[in-house]
């Protein structure tokens, strides 16, 4: 097999909100396809009408597009093996089931769960062992009798009487002993196909060569291999694909990250202001590393280096602090103009409007780019520029606007009132001359009261630049208002 013939797939069910573990799986499949020059197939497994929703389907499209994980075949781009939504492939599955039955690879099973348990108990076995392959040997007359009773059978695959083994690209040689996996259902009693059928069936028909998926699906692999072998017998499959079971993503306290964990929600990270580069970089580290000596890399660098054989089999813990730190580094790496555009779009989306023209907004964006972890942080630093969001924090006032601040504010007001031009350089020169030179104050004592008076907080973008953005009139107005609230020393 040549590298360019590699075909991988990402096949989520449209239920709920995209999960970061699911996105990690999509990323590894996408990166492997791009690294090998192969094909990334996006398929929707929407056979569960009770749980699937159009809203979740659209959320999946939104997630992949936001992350920049483009697909070569799938919804809205089509391809040679469509349709790519399983709900539109029902007739295909019915045809495959019919061929499996005709070839003797599958059979009708009429046993109820209660009957299976009763047989286990009668034989002295654990009643929870699962299906016992009883219906394999039914005669035509027995089947006819069950049908006459009105029973609706399921279709089960006839499992081989041999070990099922494969070389997992992440975990190495893996074997399930003969007889350890019972014959399993391919359809419901209604005739509707089950996931156990449609997933391998679509992989075969779409000529998938490598299945990269979560470790939680490993127990289903022997069933799928057996089905691939049966599909090869009836001319549906060309091969059994190679498998790679990716490590489990853990949350707090080494428990598997679940949909109930806040870190699992992809859109919660986006809403906080993660950028795709930062989130993808971090998710790539959940089971893979580009090198031992650094964790920061671009998506292009990942594509150049990624090999599924290098994925670690050990569970990976989602560390929010590390994810935040990596995102902060990627924000700093952005071109200033790119960052400015992304920040403007983020603030607009979240209803945060700054009373700044484009030029002033660009200045403000550059001031905060190296001071934030996620885009959300920028609003906390810049909202003082809006008069309707400006208020002096009581804790900041208690720290910086005590009686000793009165003379400092008086001197600052006088110095700024006399500044010839309202530029960062002129503001800095005027304040340093008056407060550090004239009053012999240390910078923290000199500028702390001014920062709190002008921005309402002890944490802000650089002071002199902030005053320039505020403008002369608003800056002096806030300083005078703060001075009026400060008592005499």
From Swiss-Prot:
NCBIfam families, alphabetized: gltX_bact
Localisation: Cytoplasm
UniProt family annotation: Belongs to the class-I aminoacyl-tRNA synthetase family. Glutamate--tRNA ligase type 1 subfamily.
Gene name of the encoded protein: gltX
GO terms (BP aspect): glutamyl-tRNA aminoacylation
Domain of life per record: Bacteria
Motif ('KMSKS' region): 256-260
Enzyme kind, highest EC tier: ligase
Residues that bind ATP: 259
Entry-linked InterPro entries: aa-tRNA-synth_I_cd-bd, aa-tRNA-synth_I_codon-bd_sub2, aa_tRNA-synth_I_cd-bd_sf, Glu-tRNA-ligase_bac/mito, Glu-tRNA-synth_I_codon-bd_sub1, Glu/Gln-tRNA-synth, Glu/Gln-tRNA-synth_Ib_cat-dom, Glu_tRNA_lig_a-bdl
Substrates-to-products reaction catalysed: tRNA(Glu) + L-glutamate + ATP = L-glutamyl-tRNA(Glu) + AMP + diphosphate
Species this protein is from: Mycobacterium ulcerans (strain Agy99)
GO CC, one annotated term: cytosol
Entry EC no(s): 6.1.1.17
Protein name, as recorded: Glutamate--tRNA ligase
Record's signal peptide: none
């Amino acid at each position: 097999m040549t590298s360019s013939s590699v075909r991988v797939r990402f096949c989520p069910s449209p239920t709920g909100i995209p999960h970061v573990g699911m996105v990690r799986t999509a990323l590894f499949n996408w990166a492997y396809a791009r690294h090998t020059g192969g094909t990334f197939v996006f398929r929707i497994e929407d056979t569960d009408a009770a749980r699937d929703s159009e809203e979740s389907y659209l959320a999946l499209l939104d997630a992949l597009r936001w992350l920049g994980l483009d697909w070569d075949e799938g919804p809205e781009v089509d391809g040679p093996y469509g349709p790519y939504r399983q709900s539109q492939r029902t007739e295909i599955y019915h045809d495959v089931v019919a061929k499996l039955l005709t070839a003797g690879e599958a059979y009708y099973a009429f046993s109820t769960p209660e009957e299976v348990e009763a047989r286990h108990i009668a034989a002295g076995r654990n009643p929870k062992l699962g299906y016992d392959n009883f219906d394999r040997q039914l005669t035509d007359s027995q089947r006819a009798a069950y049908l006459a009773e009105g029973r609706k059978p399921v279709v089960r695959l006839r499992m081989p009487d041999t070990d099922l083994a494969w070389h997992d690209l992440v975990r190495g040689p893996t074997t399930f002993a003969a007889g350890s996996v019972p014959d399993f259902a391919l359809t419901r009693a209604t005739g509707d196909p089950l996931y156990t059928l449609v997933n391998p069936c679509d992989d075969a028909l779409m000529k998938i060569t490598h299945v990269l998926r979560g470790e939680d699906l490993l127990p289903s692999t022997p069933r799928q291999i057996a089905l691939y072998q049966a599909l090869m017998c009836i001319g549906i499959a060309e091969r059994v694909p190679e498998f790679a079971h990716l490590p489990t993503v853990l949350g707090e306290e080494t428990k598997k990250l679940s949909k109930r964990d806040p870190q699992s929600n992809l859109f919660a990270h986006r809403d906080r202001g993660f950028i795709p580069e930062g989130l993808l970089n971090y998710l790539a580290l959940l089971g893979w590393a580009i090198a031992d000596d650094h964790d920061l890399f671009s998506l292009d660098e990942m594509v150049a280096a990624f090999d599924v054989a290098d994925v670690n089999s050990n569970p990976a813990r989602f560390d929010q602090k590390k994810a935040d730190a990596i995102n902060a580094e990627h924000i700093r790496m952005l071109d200033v103009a790119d960052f400015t555009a992304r920040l403007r779009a983020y603030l607009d989306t979240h209803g945060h409007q700054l009373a700044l023209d484009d030029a002033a907004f660009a200045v403000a964006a550059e001031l905060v780019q190296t001071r934030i972890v996620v885009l959300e942080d920028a609003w906390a630093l810049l909202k003082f520029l809006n008069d309707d969001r400006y208020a002096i924090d009581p804790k900041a006032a208690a720290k910086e606007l005590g009686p000793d601040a009165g003379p400092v504010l008086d001197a600052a007001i006088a110095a700024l009132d006399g500044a010839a031009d309202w530029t960062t350089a002129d503001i800095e020169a005027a304040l340093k001359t008056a407060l550090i030179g004239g009053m012999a104050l240390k910078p923290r004592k000199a500028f702390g009261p001014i920062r709190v008076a002008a921005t309402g907080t002890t944490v802000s973008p650089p002071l002199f630049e902030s005053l320039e953005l505020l403008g002369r009139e608003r800056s002096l107005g806030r300083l005078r208002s703060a001075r009026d609230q400060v008592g005499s020393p």
